[in-house]
């Protein structure tokens, strides 16, 4: 049937900040949904707190709310906008849980809002593990043996009592009085949440103890309604069991966990299914996890299509997944069903299903070309699959055709354990990866090796790796332990085990990885041995065969002790180049006008390999993307790449995107004119450029927008004679090179902190002695502050040089100096020296984003950090416009920024980080490229500055580029205030200290927007998941130099009814200054102490600053306890002051919600 006409406006809920388990894929799905529904004529209302998303661009929805995604805030948006329908299936778990809460609160009923895409009953049935198990039983599908630990009975009683009260209120009041009375009732219900949760936890823990006797150990624990397995895990003993149960019950919004029999080692599969309301069902893609059960699917290496299923098994699984959707009641849209198969006897069980688009949906969309989110959005408003065209084939096929693929797709996750010292790198059912790479090849081997080099962790393929503990004697057991333990490096361990003589059968016994995959890896390992022995083949046929197995030039070079350039020259001499094939959803059955391509060195049985690149004769620009997400390089850079593609299209260039991240909008088939899904290595990029140069004009390549990834390729591109648009590689190098940059600053008469540079361990000690402590030290050429630390004393320096720096040494240098740690470090520092700066205590840090065309420049935004200098800018909360800086300082910052931009001949964007101490300005860092603050600035000032920058890079003047997008912004003319807050994954890494420093650890960000600073800060906190208390007790323990300053926020909180609790010295100071407070013991002073009070929920807010290393160590347990109890915790005075202002503002009146568009209406 055609689309529904009874619906006029639709509210789409986004996913909020990037967190582990919920990343860019929901910007991709949300953006597709917005575009698809807007083109059908619906009024689109969007809520998302993440400014770095394409979906929050003001031209994508009719009303864009950058507001916290909480039920209370979304209820206000519904009251204001009165949408006809709400679509909750595009924003991950966040959107689903919010929609269900709105239904439970009666908001959807009160405002007559229909839930489309998935009914509440279907969401409940899929997400509530007890209901799901019953549903599977009903249709004859097996699930793991399991029991539940929950508090369903007492929850139902509480809910019934609440519903009786609601009915009484409805009978007693009407009109506005009814709305006020219902709001009051809901507020009372919300305030009782903590007490109810504690009762539910106690009840559920008792049930868990009973379940343990039945299920036994090991047991798999899965909380209900959580994201990426949050709170879950595998318990091997009783202590672990109760620790995970408690964590899981706390993480589950419904206080429920499922305790399952162990299915560790079984094979895991996923089916991506789409269904319409006429019951047409299609399988978009089957996905197989290379890692066996026991590892979260988001942390598993996966392949598509499934490669080790027989056709009979596939058909059984296909039918089962469709039956699951029908029974759960998913009437329209995409869903993901996960299965496990016991390889010993073939028993198939259903693990779970997601009644929404998911991470796997994004992977399946990119793997097949089928736009699941777009189709799901259109199905939600009434269309059937056969009424929709397949865009990829240009409408030659309808959307009801199941995709067919004639290639292999491999996804490998990317991890960041090095950012969280003390965290365990063992993978479990709780997701820990921060990003992923996808690669496409004609064979599994080609696809796998492309994915390994696309990870950007320094791998060129199956690089050698040391097996842990192998030198301790029992070699076989060490190898078995290494391949039997799921870690990020397990696949390389498998290859290393084979090099050390283990057979496929032995590796399978230890790892439970399917023998077919192991045989493929063994074939690669044996081929490597032959290359080592015989060298590179000198004929085209045999060299092409190696390339068809996925070997990179760099890997072949390392196997034969040559340079990668030598291998590339040999290939060029023998005319061995890849061809490019199209992803067309139909295995080449129909011609595809969509230029969505991958490279392959296929060797057909007959004739020559055929290229489907079909290069155009247009003027073209190539944009290099950011590769897999990682901490320090995420969605903000993808946002810039997308805006570059849009702007170049506006300027009539052909925009060509190169990227390998399946989660992103940049790898959507309609973001750019042409898309190459390829690893971002010099070899892969130069091959694409070789093909694109064959026709038309290559105007140049943009390396400025994708973070550090494309910048690393700039020199190789320049050497190959490729024009690089915007700022020159030499200027980028000048800003990174300490000596050259220092000379520039001297020439411009600009300050920087006293600093030094060290090319060896000995020199590092001399530089430190010369500068004195405290110091900031970091390796050169890094993004996200990798291995950047504040060093307070000689002991800290020693630990940094002997413990931290060795972790940065690449495998090839380790192999060169196997038993010489100092030799390894000095070799590394010879190329990448350590940079030392005097640490400026009590300084205000400032970020400035500016645009320049080489002559003229414009400062787009000056952001004042709430945290002091010394905390990585990506982890700091910041605000725009500045809050405490004088107009004179602001003018001087603008002058210095303009001087730097002109001196560096910046073409496009530049970011400068300043520190201001006692009125004096110091330059900390200059980045002549896009920074992670670009989207935040663009949304705040109302100008798409990344689009403007792309036009400048293509050759337009600053004036002309701004004129194309409505003229230059007038930041000072806007009365609103924006606050950016970082979001951290600490809850995923038990045991890790949450104290921030110069190494970046946040995964995402949110934005708070208001006309009042305190409310903007409050919104940013709420958006980041920090629930600011309106009443209760504040705990205060601060270092001596902060005691005067803490009086202000503490007095403010005391004046609005907060009680104050403090440790000895702070408590005496507060009392002496007229602030009534209660003394409590520090942890080292004996019990009952502050940590007990936090765990007993007697404390609701924490202000804690530390000075010495011992004080930092002493307060670590307090930081962990506040994290686990989800308490707001502030470790800087600026943060404490802002929090106190925000709490007072919230208590004084309610938050108002406004669409982004309203802030820019004159």
UniProtKB/Swiss-Prot annotation:
Pathway assigned to this chain's UniProt record: Amino-acid biosynthesis; L-arginine biosynthesis; carbamoyl phosphate from bicarbonate: step 1/1; Pyrimidine metabolism; UMP biosynthesis via de novo pathway; (S)-dihydroorotate from bicarbonate: step 1/3
Q: Which cofactor does it need?
A: Mg(2+); Mn(2+)
Gene3D superfamilies referenced in this protein's UniProt entry, alphabetically: 3.40.50.20, ATP-grasp fold, B domain, Carbamoyl-phosphate synthetase, large subunit oligomerisation domain, Methylglyoxal synthase-like domain
Concerning CDD domains, the annotation shows: MGS_CPS_II
Assembly and partners are described as: Composed of two chains; the small (or glutamine) chain promotes the hydrolysis of glutamine to ammonia, which is used by the large (or ammonia) chain to synthesize carbamoyl phosphate. Tetramer of heterodimers (alpha,beta)4.
PANTHER family reported in the protein's UniProt record: CARBAMOYL-PHOSPHATE SYNTHASE [AMMONIA], MITOCHONDRIAL, CARBAMOYLTRANSFERASE FAMILY MEMBER
This chain's protein is named: Carbamoyl phosphate synthase large chain
Q: Which organism is it from?
A: Brucella melitensis biotype 1 (strain ATCC 23456 / CCUG 17765 / NCTC 10094 / 16M)
Name of the gene: carB
């Amino acid at each position: 049937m055609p689309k529904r006409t009874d619906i006029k406006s639709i509210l789409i809920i986004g996913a909020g900040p990037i967190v582990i388990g919920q990343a860019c894929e929901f910007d991709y799905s949300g953006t597709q949904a917005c575009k698809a529904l807007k083109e059908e004529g619906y009024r689109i209302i969007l809520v998302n707190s993440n400014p770095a998303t394409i979906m929050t661009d003001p031209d994508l929805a009719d009303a864009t709310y950058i507001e916290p995604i909480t039920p209370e805030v979304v209820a206000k948006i519904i009251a204001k906008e009165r949408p006809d329908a709400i679509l909750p299936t595009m924003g991950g778990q966040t959107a689903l849980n919010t929609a269900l809460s709105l239904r439970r609160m009666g908001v959807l009923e009160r405002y007559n809002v229909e839930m489309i895409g998935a009914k509440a009953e279907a969401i409940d049935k899929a997400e509530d593990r007890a209901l799901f198990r019953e549903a599977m039983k009903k249709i004859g599908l097996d699930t793991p043996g399991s029991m539940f630990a929950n508090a369903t009975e007492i929850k139902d009683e509480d809910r019934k009592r609440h519903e009786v009260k609601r009915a009484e209120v409805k009978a007693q009041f009407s009109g506005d009085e009814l709305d006020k009375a219902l709001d009051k009732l809901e507020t009372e219900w919300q305030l009782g949440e903590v007490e109810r949760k504690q009762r539910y936890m106690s009840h559920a823990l008792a049930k868990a103890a009973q379940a343990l006797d039945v299920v036994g150990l090991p047991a798999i624990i899965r909380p209900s309604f959580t994201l990426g397995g949050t709170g879950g895990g595998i318990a091997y003993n009783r202590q672990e069991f109760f620790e995970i149960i408690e964590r899981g019950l706390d993480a589950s919004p419904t206080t429920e966990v499922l305790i399952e029999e162990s299915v560790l080692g079984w094979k895991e599969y996923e089916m991506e299914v789409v269904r319409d309301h006429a019951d047409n069902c299609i399988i978009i893609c089957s996905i197989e996890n290379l890692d066996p059960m026991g590892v979260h699917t988001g942390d598993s290496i996966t392949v598509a299509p499934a490669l080790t299923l027989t056709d009979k098994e596939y058909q059984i699984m296909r039918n089962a997944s469709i039956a699951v959707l029908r029974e759960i009641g998913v009437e329209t849209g995409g869903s993901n069903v996960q299965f496990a198969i016991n390889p010993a006897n073939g028993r198939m069980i259903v693990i779970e299903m997601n009644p929404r688009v998911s991470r796997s949906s994004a992977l399946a969309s990119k793997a097949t070309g089928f736009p699941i989110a777009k189709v799901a959005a259109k199905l939600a408003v009434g269309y059937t699959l056969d009424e929709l065209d397949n865009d990829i084939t240009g409408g030659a096929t309808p959307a009801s055709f199941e995709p067919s693929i004639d290639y292999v797709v491999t996804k490998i996750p990317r991890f960041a354990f090095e950012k969280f010292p003390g965290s365990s790198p063992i993978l479990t059912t709780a997701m820990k990866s921060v990003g992923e790479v996808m690669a496409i090849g004609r064979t599994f081997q080609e696809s796998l090796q492309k994915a390994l080099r696309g990870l950007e962790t320094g791998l060129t393929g199956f690089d050698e790796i040391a097996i842990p503990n192998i030198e301790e004697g029992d070699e076989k057991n060490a190898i078995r332990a290494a391949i039997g333990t799921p870690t990020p490096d397990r696949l390389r361990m498998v290859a290393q085990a084979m090099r050390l003589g283990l057979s496929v059968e032995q590796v399978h016994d230890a790892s439970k990885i399917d023998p077919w995959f192991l045989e493929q890896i063994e074939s690669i390992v044996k081929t490597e041995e032959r290359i080592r022995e015989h060298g590179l083949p000198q004929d085209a046929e045999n060299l092409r065969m190696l390339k068809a197995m996925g070997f990179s030039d760099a890997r072949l070079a390392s196997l034969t002790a040559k340079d990668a350039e030598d291998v590339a020259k040999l290939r060029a001499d023998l005319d061995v180049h890849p061809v490019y094939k199209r992803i067309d959803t139909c295995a080449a059955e129909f011609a595809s006008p969509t230029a969505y391509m991958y490279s392959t060195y296929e060797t057909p049985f007959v004739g020559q390999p055929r290229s489907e690149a079909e290069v155009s004769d247009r003027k073209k620009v190539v944009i290099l993307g950011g590769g897999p997400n990682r901490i320090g390089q995420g969605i903000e850079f993808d946002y810039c790449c997308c805006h570059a593609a849009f702007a170049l299209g506006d300027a009539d260039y052909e925009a060509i995107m190169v990227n390998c991240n399946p989660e992103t909008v940049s790898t959507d088939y309609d973001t750019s004119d042409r898309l190459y899904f390829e690893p971002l290595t010099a070899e892969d990029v130069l091959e694409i450029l070789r093909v694109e140069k064959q026709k038309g004009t290559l105007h140049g390549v943009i390396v400025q927008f994708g973070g550090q990834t494309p910048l690393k390729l700039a020199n190789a591109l320049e050497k190959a004679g490729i024009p690089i648009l915007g700022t020159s590689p030499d200027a980028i190098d000048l800003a990174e090179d300490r000596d050259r940059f220092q000379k520039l600053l001297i020439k411009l008469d600009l300050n920087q902190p006293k600093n030094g540079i060290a090319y060896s361990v000995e020199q590092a000690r001399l530089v430190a002695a010369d500068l004195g402590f405290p110091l900031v030290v970091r390796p050169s050429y890094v993004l996200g502050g990798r291995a950047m630390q504040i060093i307070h004393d000689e002991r800290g320096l020693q630990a940094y040089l002997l413990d931290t720096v060795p972790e940065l040494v690449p495998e090839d240098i380790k192999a060169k100096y196997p038993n010489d740690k100092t030799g390894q470090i000095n070799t590394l520092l010879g190329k990448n020296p350590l940079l030392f700066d005097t640490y400026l205590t009590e300084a205000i840090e400032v970020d400035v984003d500016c645009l320049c065309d080489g002559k003229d420049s414009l400062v787009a935004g000056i952001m004042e950090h709430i945290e002091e200098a010394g905390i990585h800018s990506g982890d700091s909360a910041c605000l725009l416009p500045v809050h405490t800086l004088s107009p004179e300082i602001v003018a001087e910052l603008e002058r210095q920024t303009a001087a730097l931009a002109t001196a560096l001949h910046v073409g496009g964007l530049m970011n400068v980080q300043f520190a201001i101490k006692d009125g004096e300005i110091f330059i900390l860092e200059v980045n002549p490229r896009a920074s992670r603050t670009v989207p935040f600035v663009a949304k705040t000032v109302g100008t798409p500055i990344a689009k403007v920058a792309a036009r400048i890079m293509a050759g337009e003047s600053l004036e002309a580029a701004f004129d194309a997008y409505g003229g230059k912004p007038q930041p000072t003319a806007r009365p609103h205030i924006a606050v950016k807050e970082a979001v951290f994954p600490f809850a995923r890494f038990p045991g890790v200290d949450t104290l921030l420093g110069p190494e970046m650890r946040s995964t995402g960000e949110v934005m708070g927007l208001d006309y009042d600073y305190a409310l903007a800060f409050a919104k940013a906190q709420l958006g980041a998941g920090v629930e600011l208390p309106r009443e209760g007790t504040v705990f205060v323990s601060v270092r001596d130099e902060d005691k005067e300053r803490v009086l202000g926020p503490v007095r403010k909180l005391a004046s609005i009814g907060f009680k104050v609790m403090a440790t000895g010295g702070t408590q005496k100071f507060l009392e002496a200054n007229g602030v009534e407070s209660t003394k409590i013991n520090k942890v080292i002073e004996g019990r009952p102490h502050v940590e007990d009070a936090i765990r007993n929920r007697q404390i609701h807010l924490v202000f804690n600053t530390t000075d010495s290393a011992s004080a930092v160590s002493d307060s670590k347990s307090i930081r962990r306890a506040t994290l686990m109890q989800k308490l707001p915790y502030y470790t800087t005075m600026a943060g404490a002051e802002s929090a106190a202002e925000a709490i007072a503002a919230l208590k004084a009146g309610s938050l108002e919600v406004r669409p982004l568009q309203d802030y820019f209406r004159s």
